[in-house]
Amino acid sequence: MNDKFHFIMYKLSNYNIIISNKGYSYWFNSLTRKFFRITEALGRKLEKLLDDINNIKNTYPSFFSILENGGFIIPTEIDELSIIRQKNQEAIQSKNYYLMVLPTLNCNFKCWYCIQNHIPSIMSENVVTNIKKHIDYLLERNEIELLHLDWFGGEPFMYFDKIIKPLTLYAKEKCENAGVQFFCGATTNGYFLTQDVVGQLDALKFLQFQITLDGQREEHDKVKYQKGCPSAFNHVLRNINNMLHASDSIILFLRINYEHNKITNDIVSQINEFITPDVRNRIKITPRKVWQETVDKDSFHNILELMDLFSANGYMVERWHPISSFIPCYANKKNYVAINFNGAVVKCTACDDLYSKEFPGILKDNGTIEWRDDFDKKYQCKSFENERCLNCKRLPVCMGLCPKDHILGHTYCKETMLDYRFEDSLINYIDHEYHGNSDAGGCDSSRGG
């Protein structure tokens, strides 16, 4: 057929989410992450037009263009679920290698909510050597495009000079010689980020850190305390400020753990005492309730007020945390492993596998990993392949249960575990995107909030 006589037929996307709230109509497509906001009255009128979408192009061409560009309406031949499955498989098979290393399970603090047993431990020279061999093995096979070395624990910076520095330098040099991208990250309590340490982070290609505060000063210092340190809160924030001044490349994810009846807005001014305005735009605030706290979705508005205050003081704020990689967890990836201090290899550090007598995997002396009972392949599961998930408009920004829970046979909807309503969080995100952009009609959520 001649192209000029070929008419494209359209259908509605299965992943359109339309929310009316406080005078606005919020339109969001969870597959494309595109959105727009209009008045509620106009939104009701436009929703009625969707009953005859193939006539919208002629009668309301500008509206049609917005819907088409945002993926709200799509050609009838497009199979969105096939797209999601393909993106999921691509994410699982990604050539970016995420190598987490735990030099120790010990820690200088003993936080009451911590899921880990802080046993005295340190990675041996033999395990360090085997990790180097593992890196050599990865690069020699020429199957990875990036190596992300991430430090975890315990408290990894207890052994900066002995383990982190030499192993990072080795990995960095090997990747440079192989033409493979490389960078480092770390989850730490921040206590050992001394002036000497932070002065070396750029050379080691550290780009991101996650550090946790346990509420405002008085609460944090009840949870984290150490002999000879009057305030761990003050000490860690000084270290953070020094680190961000020593390196222009580092982004800090500052997680704020909270209990509903203990978090107050005082924490903002307390943090401001130590963090100078010129580096606040490289700190992303991520509030999280401690996992033992009961879910209370009505508490979101209290946290929202706190986030607004942080934003007004120059910090980045995590307004919404959708899955953007088409997997529910990084452990879902084929190329993700966590190597414990003793050479045991796991896929999840948030469960008891680190302490199991039968390790899920073991790092061999030749640098390869031997998995027990195809343990690694079980983590490449498709936990969204069930009727509830496949029929959910939020599938592309959720992607189902965490692999561990899926393997254990759990079937709950993980949204029930969130401390906020999906709609409240999405509205807050879109509102702030519009507040910060004069032309928000073309916004998409990939820019972050």
Map each language-model feature to its residues:
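Detector for the c-type heme attachment site
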Residues: 114-119, 393-397
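A C-terminal junction/extension of Radical SAM enzymes
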Residues: 2-10, 279-284, 288-355, 397, ...
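Conserved glycine-rich "GG(E/T)P / GGGxP" loop and the immediately following alpha-helix
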Residues: 100, 104, 117-285
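Flexible mid-to-C-terminal extensions adjoining Fe-S/redox cofactors in radical SAM and related proteins
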Residues: 355-449
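The canonical Cys-X-X-Cys-His
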Residues: 107, 111-114
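N-terminal [4Fe-4S]-dependent radical SAM core
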Residues: 11-37, 60-100
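Short, charged low-complexity linear segments at domain edges
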Residues: 75-95, 310, 314-318, 323, ...
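Short amphipathic alpha-helical recognition elements used for nucleic-acid or partner binding
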Residues: 37-53
